[in-house]
Design a protein with these regions (language model features):
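Phosphopantetheine-dependent thiolation modules in NRPS/PKS and related acyl-activating systems
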Residues: 1-31, 40, 46-69
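Two-component histidine kinase catalytic core, primarily the HATPase_c
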Residues: 35
């Protein structure tokens, strides 16, 4: 999956127009645990990355999420 495709899917999960490397997803209006779960599922289903909650809590940006593959 390309970075652009991943970012498009992340934007869908976060219910925003678009995201970039530097988007701090936890700072977005409406951020909630349901979106956190959606990002974890997206990582596993699309990138094959299973991230534990402790690691997820240290990730701050969308670029860092993509770098987990």
């Amino acid at each position: 999956m390309t970075r652009e495709d991943f970012y498009r899917k992340v934007a869908e999960v976060l219910e925003v127009e678009s995201v970039t490397d530097g988007t701090r997803f936890r700072e977005l209006e409406g951020w909630c645990s349901l979106q956190a779960f959606g990002l974890l599922v997206l990582l596993e289903n699309e990138l094959g990355v299973r991230m534990d909650i402790e690691t997820f809590q240290t990730v701050e940006t969308v670029g860092e999420l993509y770098g987990q593959d």
